[in-house]
């Protein structure tokens, strides 16, 4: 993995910082694990914008990732590491002994030729997936399930990880990167190690067009809009004079957005403020 700063041969290249990984596969992805992915432009089935700042971008195929890691007792070998345009993490194509191939998230340190396994009997080794009741306290894991059999939901982006800090009966306590500590059933699965490609956060796109290639549209300030478009819009100066709000009038500074009270009981400690 190398961090490359481009020479200023043009204004668009002057500030570009790239993350180069020579171990990534340079050919085409494995076709049977691809699915068509169509653009929405941030619109729902009524044609209304439900997510702002989305539109355009290069065409992509969705890679079917195995988040469940439920192929127990069958060893697999890593064939290659690949780039995935749909996520910040890299992915690994693994070949199981019975001939099946699957994509998984590539943990830090995994390379072509390594062997991995899933299930209760899997060893404590980076890339292996097993229930958290079988993982030692203090271990670093990723792709963590929140419900047994549902598939990993926590710690899936580049460089992400979760630490198992305690085990109490049928629950384990996890410390998330945000500082939050929460309980999860110990039968939930997790993959050992942390997600690779942690250098992703160091990249600099260098120009607006690089964001447009990725399907990201500009973010316009509310104060730069007209009154019809945003509560902050209009006026002769830049002063708003009220508490800042979203385009729909909801407070933006410190308002709680979590509404799932049913699972509040599993949160041992709230995330820390930045």
UniProtKB/Swiss-Prot annotation:
Superkingdom of the source species: Bacteria
Annotated segments matching region Disordered: 28-54, 221-274
Ranges of compositional bias, category Polar residues: 39-49
Organism in which the protein naturally occurs: Photorhabdus laumondii subsp. laumondii (strain DSM 15139 / CIP 105565 / TT01)
Family of this protein: Belongs to the universal ribosomal protein uL2 family.
The keyword Secreted belongs to this UniProt entry's keyword annotation: no
GO cellular component, one term: large ribosomal subunit
InterPro entries: NA-bd_OB-fold, Rib_uL2_dom2, Ribosomal_uL2, Ribosomal_uL2_bac/org-type, Ribosomal_uL2_C, Ribosomal_uL2_CS, Ribosomal_uL2_dom3, Ribosomal_uL2_RNA-bd_dom
Subunit structure: Part of the 50S ribosomal subunit. Forms a bridge to the 30S subunit in the 70S ribosome.
Chain's role: One of the primary rRNA binding proteins. Required for association of the 30S and 50S subunits to form the 70S ribosome, for tRNA binding and peptide bond formation. It has been suggested to have peptidyltransferase activity; this is somewhat controversial. Makes several contacts with the 16S rRNA in the 70S ribosome.
Example of a GO biological process term: cytoplasmic translation
Keyword Ribosomal protein: yes
Keywords: Ribonucleoprotein, Ribosomal protein, RNA-binding, rRNA-binding
Protein name as it appears in the record: Large ribosomal subunit protein uL2
GO molecular function terms noted in the UniProt entry: rRNA binding; structural constituent of ribosome; transferase activity
Lineage of source species: Bacteria, Pseudomonadati, Pseudomonadota, Gammaproteobacteria, Enterobacterales
Database matches in Gene3D superfamilies: 2.30.30.30, Nucleic acid-binding proteins (2.40.50.140), Ribosomal protein L2, domain 3 (4.10.950.10)
HAMAP family (UniProt xref): Ribosomal_uL2_B
NCBIfam families: rplB_bact (TIGR01171)
